[in-house]
């Protein structure tokens, strides 16, 4: 993290339709517009999961950057990885139930890649964040009710850590916001690396127990 990033943030464009990512950015104090990217890769096993997430985030950022002459594009891609491979967003309720059956009572990895692209000069930065999550041993009936609610259908791995009624997680190691879909610690680090000073909301408190999120929150407050 630079000792004193002084650049003023340009207009921020979020290349995602995710309501969770919008909420995280808003709570952090960022003002931004939303222009979701439809560009997306589908896993075929040809690259490692972390590399796949990076490529997907970069493709989304470049897709939206082509529509703007200036502005800072923020794109992200989140995947769930178990012993058998990548679990993206389920294509059907049957697939969602299969994902939940695979994950129940077991640990898995959540990887989020964040990509920032300055549309004015083409500067680009990417980084990934990984968390390990163990699901609680929910029953098949619980999983079916959750799937029938429709809540998991737009989420990687067919669950949302923030879905309190289903409450899927038993234990989380790493960044909570990474599991939600946008690790604040990774985002702030990338913004700093691009030379900008992110002025975070004074009342923002990162959810979860991520040490890096809390450190960045403290450091940014000190630099204001």
UniProtKB/Swiss-Prot annotation:
Report the domain of life of the source organism: Bacteria
What sections of the protein cross the membrane? none
The coenzyme or cofactor needed here is: a divalent metal cation
State the reactions this protein catalyses.
dTTP + H2O = dTMP + diphosphate + H(+); UTP + H2O = UMP + diphosphate + H(+)
- One GO BP annotation of this record: nucleotide metabolic process
Q: Does the keyword Chloroplast apply?
A: no
Query: What is the enzyme's class at the highest EC level?
Result: hydrolase
- Molecular-function annotations in GO: dTTP diphosphatase activity; UTP diphosphatase activity
Compartments, record wording: Cytoplasm
Q: Which residues form a coiled coil?
A: none
Look up the record and report any one GO term of the cellular component aspect: cytoplasm
Sorted keywords for this record are: Cytoplasm, Hydrolase, Nucleotide metabolism
Q: What is its EC number?
A: 3.6.1.9
* Record's keyword annotation contains Cytoplasm: yes
- Enumerate the active-site residues: 77
Q: Where is this site: Important for substrate specificity?
A: 20, 78, 162
Function of the molecule: Nucleoside triphosphate pyrophosphatase that hydrolyzes dTTP and UTP. May have a dual role in cell division arrest and in preventing the incorporation of modified nucleotides into cellular nucleic acids.
Stated family: Belongs to the Maf family. YhdE subfamily.
* Protein name as annotated: dTTP/UTP pyrophosphatase
């Amino acid at each position: 993290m630079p000792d004193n990033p002084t650049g003023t943030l340009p207009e921020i464009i979020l290349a995602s339709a995710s309501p969770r990512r919008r909420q995280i950015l808003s709570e952090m104090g960022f003002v931004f517009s939303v222009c979701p990217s439809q560009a997306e890769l589908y896993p075929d096993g040809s690259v490692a999961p972390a590399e796949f997430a990076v490529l997907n985030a970069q493709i989304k950022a470049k897709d939206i950057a082509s529509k703007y002459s200036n502005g800072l594009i923020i794109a992200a891609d989140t995947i769930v990885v178990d012993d058998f491979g990548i679990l993206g967003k389920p294509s059907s309720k049957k697939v969602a139930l299969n994902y939940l059956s695979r994950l129940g009572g077991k640990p898995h990895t959540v990887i989020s890649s964040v990509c920032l692209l300055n549309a004015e000069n083409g500067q680009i930065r990417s980084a990934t964040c990984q968390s390990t999550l163990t699901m609680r041993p929910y029953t098949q009936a619980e999983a079916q009710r959750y799937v029938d609610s429709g809540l998991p259908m737009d989420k990687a791995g067919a669950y949302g850590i923030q879905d309190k009624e289903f409450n899927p997680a038993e234990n989380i190691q790493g960044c909570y916001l990474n599991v939600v879909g946008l690790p604040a610690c990774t985002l702030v680090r990338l913004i700093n690396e691009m030379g900008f000073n992110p002025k975070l909301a004074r009342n923002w408190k990162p959810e979860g127990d991520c040490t890096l999120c809390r450190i960045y929150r403290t450091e940014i407050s000190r630099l204001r």
